[in-house]
Amino acid sequence: MESVAAGSPSVGASLSSSSSTVLQLLLPMVVLVYVVVQTVVRRRMNTCTAPLPPGPMPWPVVGNLPEMLLSCKPAFRWIHHVMERTGTGIACVKLGGVHVVAITCPNIALLKMQDTNFASRPLTFASETFSRGYMAAIMAPYGDQWRKMRRVLTSEIVCPSRHKWLHDKRADEANNLTRYVYNLAGAGSGGAVVDVRHVARHYCGNVVRRLVFGTRYFGEPQADGGPGPLEVQHVDAAFASLGLVYAFCVSDYLPWLLGLDLDGHQKMIREANEMMTRLPGVLIDDRWRQWKSGEKQGLEDLLDVLITLEDAEAKPVLTIEEVKALSQDITLVAMDNPSNAVEWALAEMVNSPETLKKAGEEIDGVVGRDRLVQESDIPRLNYLKACIREAFRLHPVVPFNVPHVALADATVAGYHIPRGSHVILSRIGLGRNPAVWDDPLCFDPDRHVPADPTADVTLTENDLRFISFSTGRRSCIAASLGTAMSVMLFAGVLLEEAGRDGGRRPQRVEARHFHGKAAGAARRATAAVALLLGYLYVIHRP
């Protein structure tokens, strides 16, 4: 579930607001080093037989940062605008001294062809903060620590046996989801409006807390099955963190600005991280003490697994700081992708009543009306999975995937990719590429339904026609968990006879394409559900 935010419009806006101050500091430096940099660039280009990917001519030292800051657009929009001007599936902009190579063409499958060379991550203030100094796996640069943590995750946390071991906890949260929505809907008279974003995000938060910490609540349990104040704080901090990491902050490309915090980016990161780590930290410290004192014996959740891991010499594999870092990694990657996909799928399906009808008919045929959806039903819920795939394609949770760093010079699609370049795959560009998809802005789940009715629809996309859980050496390794969470969330909401005959027609939802929330902002249309006369509907909420 590689879905860590890469390019936040909210952060982009704050960068634009401080552009004048930044430029006043930068321009004198530009003049001083212009000749030196030009000489170095010419020598560098003379040693390369292949050209850089097309893109705007950079300024010395600052690269294309002035254009990005003065564009008054979020960084991800500006980069996509540059790619539209070049008219190619690959483009290069230079931010400070870093070449940022954006790709929208699935045929340029560099992560398959040169996987190891692009297996590292950028070193940024946000990634260092959220990973506790690169102790975990997702944001760590390629090296021994990443290999160690990746090995722990693959062999102990997301392996098939562990997935099966945690089944009952996931099932409890799926059942609680249905109960919570029912309680919310019954709270009003004549039908109630239920915020799908709120429900979806907190379902994901509940699942993560149950799997990792063995509890749904940090504080007092709530009678309706919903989150309490502490749980709301934790989930809000998680989504704030996801919106800040890899957000094209100026100081990530001009390290000598680090500490000035001209745009307030560093302050926001520290605050989000403190809120993100405070509550889990108390649980982890207490659990660590219980195991070391012999007070606790049996394994009950993933935290127990991490604490008790031992090597061949019976020595602990992980320190307490590494346990905290991995716990935060798991929390961040598991929350946003399923909730975003389900929210957008519901919003789009309201505009296409036929899709709601087909989804309801599939649930009737597979599940029936006398029980709730179970994970064992997932292989047969192909149309529901097709709807989720289409949401992943058309409405990705973030504009770009997590950046890959080139460990050595490389040639991709005939272009030179210098060592240290940040390579970003555009989730928007891939999923909406008209050369790959017919009518790419149309929500059409049937495009994912195979002609063979016995074939299985999966949420993964190995051909990079769109990105759900990513691919390659740095791909998400928890696709099974991501699939289970996405389908159970989607089916759990649809189970209340969504859009079936006999009820009132739902209102239309305006599905805006990244006119707001792309990595954390909330300006787009928000879907909500209403229980009216016993039927579930999705309606527009401004």
Regions found by a protein language model. Give the residues of each.
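Cytochrome P450 proximal C-terminal region
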Residues: E2-L15, Q24, P53, M83, ...
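Conserved, non-catalytic sequence blocks in retroelement Pol enzymes and Pol-derived host proteins
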Residues: S19-T21, C48-P53, M68-C72, V158-H167, ...
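Conserved cytochrome P450 K-helix E-x-x-R motif and the immediately C-terminal K′/meander segment
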Residues: L65-G87, R278, P353, L372-G414, ...
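Cytochrome P450 heme-thiolate monooxygenase catalytic core
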Residues: P122-F130, K164-V342, K358, E375
